[in-house]
Amino acid sequence: MKGKIIKGIAGFYYVKVEENLIECKARGKFRHKDVKPMVGDNVIIQVENGKGVIESIEKRSSELLRPAVANISLAFVVFAIKSPDINFDLLNKFLVLCEYNHIEAIVCLNKVDLVSEEERENVKKRINDIGYEVLYINAKEGLGTDILKEKINGNITVLCGPSGAGKSTLINKLTDKEHMLTGIVSEKIGRGKHTTRHSELIEVSNGYIVDTPGFSTLEIKELMEKEELKYCFPEFEEHNESCKYRGCLHNKEPKCAIKQDVEDGKINKYRYEFYVKTLEEIIEGEKNKW
């Protein structure tokens, strides 16, 4: 039987086959091959003695490692515009992760009622200028959920972002159900209390959304080689191969087209600085491997 993994908890996988949800374990062969089923996987299962067994996993179109979700076609990157303030480094990490996995990213700015229209527009422009769509939402009030449902149609959509951004509240509004516990932001540290316990696909508008555990730890230096990073910045695309030296990393090399674009104001200086900082982390990580 063919189905899709909807949820995974403690080694058990819940596979949707038509209208049925079957609890499954994975065959031992996956462990020996160092392959682990992921939420979102399309799988073939057999039912033995009333228990489901995952026999095979179909090829994945995409995957996120942290959180572990497969076959995602769209990501809502959810950040509160205030309380807590946006951590742009963390936002950039999420965007790089999406680009690396060839997943379309839409930035959803929550709690927009806490700032002025001018502040909203300034943040939106900053994100638009690097090539990403921005949607304003208010998870508590349900503002923006209609357009989000339109985007979800036909996709597996991941909601990612820092804890306290309102992801679980947003899912409750999108599904009209309390699928996840919701928490409050700790006044002491400005972070949300960890409220989501596992990754789970939830059916919405002829598609799926998946919420993921808070405090996602993103270590870009563990994901990619230094040569790959520049392709995760859409604004570099036009001139990535225009530098004097082939394989230019856009850092210390002379006559670099990207550095020239930064000087000319065509590429955001902060984004470029984030790129260089991340590149140096990857290079340092590669040194430590040996």
Swiss-Prot record:
InterPro entries with a match to the protein in the record: G_CP_dom (IPR030378), NA-bd_OB-fold (IPR012340), P-loop_NTPase (IPR027417), Ribosome_biogen_GTPase_RsgA (IPR004881), RsgA_GTPase_dom (IPR010914), RsgA_N (IPR031944)
Residues bound to GTP: 110-113, 161-169
Record-annotated CP-type G domain positions: 61-218
Any GO BP annotation: ribosomal small subunit biogenesis
Homology family: Belongs to the TRAFAC class YlqF/YawG GTPase family. RsgA subfamily.
HAMAP family: GTPase_RsgA (MF_01820)
Protein name, UniProt field: Small ribosomal subunit biogenesis GTPase RsgA
Organism phylogeny: Bacteria, Bacillati, Bacillota, Clostridia, Eubacteriales
